[in-house]
């Protein structure tokens, strides 16, 4: 079954300019669920400070948002070739080194998702016809390629952090 589990899911925060659109492709029935969270400091039962994630209620310039996409194989067969693509929302900057995802190969795009590669290999055009190495602030998309097959009923999780401009 090719691409039978493609699902688009948008997360729109109260600030209309902050959004993410995750897509999943696979040989199987993959369902994705995305969430935008902020890390907050709370006092636990022992009176100690600890960090906790909560859904974003308000994102203001300078604040950090964590985008997480959970993907689940809802089919009866293992799903292969699982790929999660996520654009970096407009008016945000990717936090270098923040992309995560167990059992995934992570690549980036600096040209609107046309091409993906490792950060050190990405180049962007600059005025005058020259090129320079892309920096995290230039990244437009992140791609996670799940390594191996995702068993029926199993779930994976990928994500990244951004700072609101």
Tell where the protein language model's regions lie, with residue ranges.
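Bacterial N-terminal signal peptides
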Residues: 8-17
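N-terminal secretory signal peptides that target proteins for export/translocation
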Residues: 1-2
């Amino acid at each position: 079954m090719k691409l039978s589990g493609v699902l688009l899911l948008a997360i729109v925060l109260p600030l209309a300019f902050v959004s993410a659109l995750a897509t999943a492709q696979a040989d199987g029935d993959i369902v994705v669920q995305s969430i935008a969270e902020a890390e907050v400091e709370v006092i636990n039962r022992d009176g100690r400070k600890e960090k906790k994630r909560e859904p974003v209620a308000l994102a203001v310039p300078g604040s950090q948002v964590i985008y997480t996409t959970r993907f689940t194989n809802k089919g009866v067969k293992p799903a292969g070739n699982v790929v999660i693509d996520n654009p970096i929302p407009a008016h945000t900057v990717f936090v270098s080194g923040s992309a995560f995802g167990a059992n995934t190969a992570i690549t980036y795009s600096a040209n609107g998702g046309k091409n993906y590669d490792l950060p050190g290999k990405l180049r962007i055009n600059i005025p005058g016809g020259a090129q320079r190495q892309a920096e995290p602030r230039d990244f437009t998309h992140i791609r996670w390629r799940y390594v191996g097959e995702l068993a029926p009923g199993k779930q994976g999780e990928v994500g990244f952090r951004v700072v609101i401009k």
